[in-house]
Amino acid sequence: APPQPSDNFIRF
């Protein structure tokens, strides 16, 4: 599955 905004937020 493509990276979702939620996953991107976790990276920060």
From Swiss-Prot:
One of its GO terms (cellular component) is extracellular region. It comes from the Eukaryota. GO terms for biological process: neuropeptide signaling pathway. Transmembrane segments: none annotated. Keywords: Amidation, Neuropeptide, Secreted. Disulfide bonds: none annotated. The modification Phenylalanine amide is found at F12. It is found in: Secreted. Belongs to the FARP (FMRFamide related peptide) family. Has modulatory actions at skeletal neuromuscular junctions. This is FMRFamide-18.
